[in-house]
Swiss-Prot record:
Record's protein name: Schlafen family member 8
Protein species of origin: Mus musculus (Mouse)
Details of cofactor binding: Can also use Mn(2+).
UniProt-annotated catalytic positions: 205, 210
CC annotations in GO: cytoplasm
């Protein structure tokens, strides 16, 4: 990673600030400067602006070398450079300036690719693409917009280009163009062994031919300078020949042998070309190679060796060739200002999101934040269709009313005021000048932003008000010298997340103010903020619409989680929690040490379990080895273990006397309805571990769903009446409509005739069942002989794979682990036949991870689920087993029973 040598990141205020050193400001004074120094200053300012545009916006601070009592303009050269950077005459769209005494500031708004002038903009901002192409006889540098279109076309071309016999797409254009280059009139000269000084070539410059002279004695430096750009231009167009040693009149001059020798010419050319960066969209094995050939031809004068002509034949490249790494910068408080490498730059430029890789995504999910109009670091955000949109979530959680300043959540405000007598008066004094907006209170805003909690903080309050920038108030009981740093860091993180996660594209900086209950004099009492810099009024939220836009970005910041679809789609996307899930997650952990969460199938219990473990780490400043996650089955254990947020074990391992529990303080139990007591009292042991530090007991949260009970034995849970405090998750977010309808019917059957091991009171939750209706899904129930069933499943899997699904989308589940072991090899064998008989290269079909038992697969999900003869060995839980099976399927559910050949029957719902 290349860091900037002369740009420093400052920590003095809650914004991303780059200090650019001493700079001359003002047109008159800049015109008097030494041209080299003026250019260096301009480059430094432009690179700082590029870094901030690409990193969420911020502030460029500089010390004015020319003292002035009156405001001065920036300077025409600086303004022009910034306009060229954003490719727009409207500099005010991204920049504002302010002079304070001898300090000059440029306020930078985050870059976004939203088309403001009707033209498409690239995903990131760059000073130069380092991509070249040929235009008739010229080498042309592509600007960022042209580079974006070029890369987009290359990616699309590779994606849809046919191949012969499975050959990499890269091989086809290279072979096709070989004959074209050899038929070029320059090829005959390229093949020559000697030429005459002063000879006139019979062809001229063209798209595929360029003449350059050795016009300097510094031959090697000259070649290193020109070769990369021409290699890029020819390779990105149709290939061609670079003649070094021919003038514009087609006369061969060569390079005198006194200035260079033959071997060094070829070595310099080859070494220079070997350093040229390339990027592949295709599957070419020649990942780092430009295909070229260098010839050094002797040039004779009157029969004597005079010098050498260097000719480089360049073949067209399958993807993209650069002259050097693109010139694009980013900034981070930890890394400083750093330059993107070629791969990082290309991936950000052509990051179109998951729409291009999944046609079904738009059918099943609604886009909440798209990459096509958001800042560079944003990830796309989707919610399952039928769930609340970010606009609806904002209205429910953070509603803004005209001429009304509200405190939210009201219950927390009342609780805090009852605990701290001076709090109400102090806060009201701070915000008395605001009449429209919200004061959003948290015990710790830091925890909800994935930062460490500061225990001395009574609460944090975020003010979103009209005619004001956002202000974060940190309220302390006693004076604390670290309080302002905490507040600044929290505000800075919030601002960055509003832009880079929430997708907010307006101007924003979260101002800070630390208040102390014990102090008799909190100096600023008019709602102002502690900041050494006066921000422009454009950073104020001007009206309710701007407040709502910011609050919708805040909804994404607070409710997002990494979608399980990310791994399947090959790119990171985010989903949003439901309001019901968020309300459980936002509970104060210090006040809710123990909690039973009852959730209906597909309501997101495991998601909440993962999110709560992340919150535990930040609230209690603990490491992953202090948090223990316990479940019944190995697949769910492995899934959680891969997240690296805790130590994950099965209940059986937890109860093993060899298992050491000394380091654990917090315990999360998932799928607890399927626990057993055969190895001892797991509940008593877990509770004792979480309570062993009496002065600060740990967290003990239990997630369960009695409807998904898969056995009739004692679970070890306390009586239902003693499961308190208790919360419920009743909104199904996983399954398609037809599957959800099936779940509802099975839930009612269990409710009407429950197994004796399930407490009847726990089943009343079924009356609250609801799901998001809009994703269709389908269910099919069939009866087959074993032989026909194996063929049916293999055919269906093959069809799904041809439609673009992967093996990670499919699960084949058996009633018991014994049946899985008995029949798995038969299903695998039939699937391998399909692979061998087709052109599809699914070598990984040999992997058996898609096969499991219904019980072991508890807590996991797949788009497509086959249930193989789902008949419970214990009749009272037959509907529970069916419910467990169905709840694993998001879109397609196949319930397949064994029958005699004569007994085949079929029912379908779709």
């Amino acid at each position: 990673m290349e860091t900037h040598p002369s740009l420093a990141v400052k920590w003095s205020c809650p914004d991303l600030t780059i200090y650019a050193g001493e700079v001359t400001i003002g047109e008159e004074d800049r015109n008097k400067m030494d041209s080299k120094k003026r250019k260096l200053e301009k480059t430094r300012i432009t690179e700082a602006a590029c870094a901030l545009l690409n990193s969420g916006g911020g502030l460029i601070a500089m010390q004015m070398t020319n003292k002035s009592e009156h405001p001065v303009e920036m300077g025409q050269d600086l303004e022009k450079s910034l306009r060229e950077l954003i490719m727009s005459p409207n500099m005010q769209a991204f920049f504002e300036t302010k002079q304070q005494e001898d300090q000059f500031y440029i306020f930078v708004k985050s870059w976004s690719c939203r088309p403001e002038d009707g033209s498409t903009k690239p995903r990131i901002c760059s000073l130069g693409s380092s991509l070249y192409c040929r235009s008739i006889t010229s080498k042309v540098a592509m600007d960022s917009r042209e580079a974006f279109e070029f890369l987009k076309d290359k990616k699309a071309c590779i994606k849809y280009r046919p191949t012969d016999d499975g050959a990499p797409p890269a091989k086809i254009p290279r072979a096709m163009c070989q004959n074209s280059l050899e038929s070029n009139p320059a090829f005959e000269i390229f093949q020559s062994k000697k030429l005459e000084y002063g000879q006139c070539l019979l062809f001229s410059e063209s798209t595929s031919i360029e003449f350059k002279q050795f016009s300097t004695k510094h031959v090697q430096a000259y070649m290193k300078n020109i070769i990369p750009e021409y290699i890029s231009a020819f390779a990105n167009t149709q290939g061609g020949y670079l003649f070094i040693g021919v003038d514009d009149k087609r006369i061969i001059l060569g390079c005198p042998k006194d200035n260079v020798d033959r071997d060094s010419l070829k070595t310099v050319a080859n070494e220079t070309i070997s350093k040229v960066p390339v990027f592949h969209f295709c599957s070419s094995k020649d990942k780092d190679k430009v295909s070229y050939e260098t010839r050094v031809i002797d040039v004779f004068q009157e029969g004597n060796l005079y010098g050498y002509l260097c000719v480089i034949k360049v073949e067209p490249f399958c993807c993209a060739v650069f002259s050097e790494a693109p010139i694009s910068w980013m900034v981070d408080k930890e890394k400083g200002v750093y330059r993107l490498n070629t791969e990082e730059w290309v991936r950000m430029m052509v990051d179109f999101g998951p729409e291009a890789s999944s046609k079904d995504l738009s059918k099943d999910f609604e886009c909440q934040l798209s990459l096509c109009n958001s800042p560079p670091h944003c990830r796309p955000v989707y919610s399952k269709k039928g769930l609340q949109h970010k606009v609806d979530l904002q209205q429910r959680l953070f509603q803004v009313s005209p001429d009304c300043l509200k405190y939210t959540p009201e219950s927390l405000w009342k609780e805090l005021c009852s605990q701290h007598k001076r709090l109400k008066g102090l806060v009201k004094q701070q915000i008395r000048s605001f009449s429209c907006g919200l004061l959003i209170l948290y015990r710790s805003w830091a925890v909800d932003l994935n930062l460490k909690e500061k225990q001395e903080v009574i609460c944090d309050a975020l003010l979103i008000a009209q005619n004001s920038p956002p202000i974060l108030y940190t309220i302390l009981g006693e004076q604390d010298e670290q309080g302002q740093d905490y507040c600044n860091h929290t505000a800075f993180t919030l601002k960055q997340k509003l832009v880079n996660t929430g997708g907010y594209t307006g101007r924003v900086c979260v101002m800070t103010k630390v208040l102390c209950l014990s102090s008799q004099n909190n100096i600023e009492t008019n709602g102002g903020s502690v900041s050494p810099i006066n921000y422009p009024s454009s950073y104020n939220l001007a009206n309710i619409q701007e407040m709502q836009d910011l609050l919708q970005a805040l909804v994404i910041v607070l409710l997002n989680f990494r979608s399980f679809l990310s791994d399947q789609l090959g790119c990171e996307i985010l989903n949003l929690l439901t309001a019901q899930q968020y309300e459980i997650l936002s509970k104060s952990l210090r006040k809710t040490r123990e909690l039973f969460v009852h959730g209906l199938p597909g309501s997101g219990k495991t998601i909440i379990a993962m999110k709560i473990m992340e919150k535990i780490r930040n609230t209690f400043h603990c490491e992953t080895d202090s948090i223990l996650y316990i479940c019944e089955n190995q697949p769910l254990r492995d899934f959680i273990r891969a997240k690296r947020i805790c130590q994950a074990v099965t209940r059986k391992t937890f109860m093993n006397y060899r298992f050491k529990t000394n380091s654990f303080q917090h315990i999360i139990v998932d799928e607890a309805q399927n626990f057993r007591t055969e190895d001892g009292n797991w509940y008593g042991k877990a509770k004792a571990i979480s309570r062993r530090v009496k002065s600060c007991p740990g967290m003990f949260w239990i997630f369960l769903d009695y409807f998904q009970t898969s056995h009739l034995k004692e679970s070890g849970l306390p009586d239902f009446s003693r499961q308190y405090p208790r919360e419920e998750l009743t909104q199904v977010v996983r399954n398609g409509d037809k599957i959800a309808e099936f779940l509802q019917k099975e839930l009612q059957k269990i409710r009407d005739n429950p197994p004796c091991s399930i407490p009847r009171q726990s089943l009343n939750i079924v009356h609250e069942f609801k799901w998001s209706q809009s994703v269709s899904g389908n269910i099919k129930t069939e009866q087959f002989t074993l032989e026909d069933m194996v063929i049916y499943v293999a055919d269906k899997c093959y069809d799904f794979l041809r439609k673009g699904y992967s093996l990670q989308d499919i699960a084949v589940l058996f009633s018991t682990d014994k049946e899985k072991k008995t029949y798995e090899s038969m299903f695998l064998g039939e699937m391998r036949k399909r692979r061998r008989a087709s052109e599809m290269n699914h070598a990984y079909l040999c992997d058996s991870n898609m096969f499991d038992s219904i019980r072991r697969f508890s807590g996991l999900e797949r788009s497509i689920v086959f249930g193989i003869n789902p008949i419970a060995t214990e009749q009272p839980i037959s509907h529970n087993l069916l419910l467990c099976l169905a709840s694993r399927a998001m879109k397609h559910l196949y319930i397949l029973y064994f029958s005699t050949p004569e007994g085949h029957s079929s029912t379908e719902a779709c």
